[in-house]
C-alpha cells in the first residue's frame, strides 16, 4: 500500500457584510471571507492538501477563478469533486489535520458541526478529521482582523482504482471504516 502526505495553505481577506463560510458551515460574524467562490478557506486548504498528496496540482488548476462557472460556488461541491478525482486515481483519505488562524469570531464552538459536514461530504468517519483554531496573538494581517488563514495536512493511501470505486459506490460509511482498518492491517 502506498501512503502519501499533502499540505495545504490558504488565506482570504475579510470584508464587512459578506457571509462567513468555514468548514462547510456559515459562521455568524459581521465580516466574511472575500473570494471567487464562497471563500471557505478551510475547505480550500483541504482540497489543496488532497490534490497535492496525489500529485494532482492544486485547487486553482482544477477550479480556476477565471472560470465563471465557479463564481460564488459552494466549496463543498469543489471538495466533493476533489474526492471523486482522488478516488478515480485509486486513493482514499486516511486522515486530515487542519488549523484555522483567526482572531474573531471564536470558531471552537463551531468545530463539531464543521467536522460533521466535512465527513459527510468526503464520505469518511468524523474521527478522520481534526480541526483546530488559533490566533496570531494580534500579529500580522490575521491579528489585525484583515484576513483568515488555514493550514491542512492530509494522509492518503492507495487502495487501487477498482477498490476505491467499489468502496464508495456500494458500502455504507460504517462498513467502509471497518473495512479500511482491516485493509491497513493486511496491506
List PLM regions with ranges.
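RNase III-family endoribonuclease catalytic core
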Residues: 2-113, 122
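Short, low-complexity, polybasic intrinsically disordered segments
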Residues: 111-115, 144-145
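Short acidic capping loops at alpha-helix termini that bridge into adjacent secondary structure
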Residues: 125-128
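Pyridoxal 5′-phosphate
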Residues: 131-135
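C-terminal edge-of-domain segments
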Residues: 142-160
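Intrinsic, low-complexity polybasic segments
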Residues: 161-162, 178
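Short, intrinsically disordered C-terminal tails of secreted or membrane-associated proteins
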Residues: 182-186
Amino acid at each position: 500500500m502506498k501512503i502519501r502526505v499533502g499540505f495545504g495553505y490558504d488565506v482570504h481577506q475579510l470584508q464587512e457584510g459578506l457571509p462567513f463560510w468555514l468548514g462547510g458551515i456559515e459562521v455568524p460574524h459581521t465580516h466574511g471571507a472575500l473570494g471567487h467562490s464562497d471563500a471557505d478557506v478551510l475547505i480550500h486548504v483541504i482540497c489543496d492538501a488532497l490534490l497535492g498528496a496525489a500529485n494532482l496540482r492544486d485547487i486553482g488548476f482544477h477550479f480556476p477563478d477565471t472560470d465563471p462557472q465557479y463564481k460564488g460556488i459552494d466549496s463543498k461541491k469543489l471538495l466533493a469533486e476533489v474526492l471523486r478525482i482522488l478516488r478515480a486515481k485509486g486513493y482514499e483519505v486516511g486522515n486530515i489535520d487542519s488549523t484555522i488562524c483567526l482572531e474573531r469570531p471564536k470558531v471552537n464552538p463551531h468545530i463539531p458541526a464543521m467536522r460533521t459536514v466535512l465527513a459527510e461530504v468526503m464520505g469518511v468517519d468524523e474521527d478522520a478529521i481534526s480541526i483546530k483554531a488559533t490566533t496570531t496573538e494580534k500579529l500580522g494581517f490575521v491579528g489585525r482582523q484583515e484576513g483568515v488563514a488555514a493550514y491542512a495536512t492530509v494522509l492518503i493511501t492507495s487502495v487501487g482504482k477498482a477498490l476505491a470505486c467499489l468502496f464508495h459506490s456500494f458500502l455504507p460509511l460504517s462498513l467502509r471504516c471497518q473495512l479500511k482498518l482491516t485493509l491497513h492491517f493486511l496491506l
